[in-house]
Amino acid sequence: KGFFWYYFETNDRDPVIEKEQSAPCRFIDPHRAARFPFRVSYFGNRINFEVFHGLTDGLGALRFASRLTEHYLELKKNLPVITEEKEFSPLKEDDYLRYYRKLPKRHYESEPALQVSGEFLPFDQMGILKGTLQVADLKAQCRKYGVSITKYLAAALLWSVIRTETDGKNLKKPAALNLPVNLRSFFDSETLANFFAVVNISWPKGRAPENFREVLTNVSRQMDEQIVKERLEETISYNVSNEKKWYVRAIPLFIKHLAMELIFLRTSRAHTMTFSNIGPAKIREDLREDVEDFELLVGASPKQRMKCGAVAYDGKLCLAFTSAMAENRLPEVFFRFLEDQGIPVEQESNGITDREHDKGRYPVIAQDRRKIKKAVRMFYLSLVFVSV
């Protein structure tokens, strides 16, 4: 990091590849793992690519993970290695600046949203519960309602949140989804650096919806209004214009960091959870049968205790919930709703919060909760003793 801004430097070290031994989405320490802002590991026949969000977004990470998988199979099967000299050069492009236009100022407001309730998991643990379904089954249901897959799934998630976190009659706070939008779909861009925006899709506080169709109609309208090029240009303008202000550029980085932490805390409170659908993963045709599936795991945070990632491959869609909570009420209600709608779901977990669907394809992470709670109490007791 510099005095005013963070920046990336070229790293000529070799990345360290390790066997997965812990829960996913751990903090990536920039001073370890040969100082790379990403982590590559394996477990059984699964390849993991975890990345710091400042380096790339979900689509960029998917592109790299797909190519990494292809290259592994090329080496394993002794196939000719296909290389493209400029395959990942667009990582240096900043298309936020490229498509920035100075527009009239727009004021953004947010209010605290419903939070997923329940007991937290111990330190350094993350529960995974994923459901795999056939894209054809999902599309058939979407056609009945006349909506896209993302609209249908976002509405189903909101409906599940309302059913699990309210009395079904009134909402004291809005139920809100943080929905990332791939800007490459609206602007001419091939960058692998971050190029996305987020929109807030919610059901307002007050009267609860009577049925799923009511939620779907509301979600569909919001997405039609917000996910259009004109509104996304306003978002780019708002974000970039703040970076361009001379007094912001002159503020030392440690003060910027504190301000960004406060902004992140405030904005994260405005969403119940994040739902990221990055679309289909692509593997070259002669290697498709060697790859079973892809999954997208989005790290949970203190204010967004559960998140959901979706990625499709070979006619199947994987919906993966990552959770810092000890209960699975929300994903269980969500998957049950899909099955009630005529969409069979095959579930799998990493065994931390759900033993029934654990197939042994994730590392075993055993921790004694009583010992952890005792250690936490002793830690705070020692702080009190030192302060006295």
Report each predicted region and the residues it spans:
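Helical lid/core segments from catalytic subdomains that handle acyl or acyl-like groups
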Residues: I128, F195-G279, D286
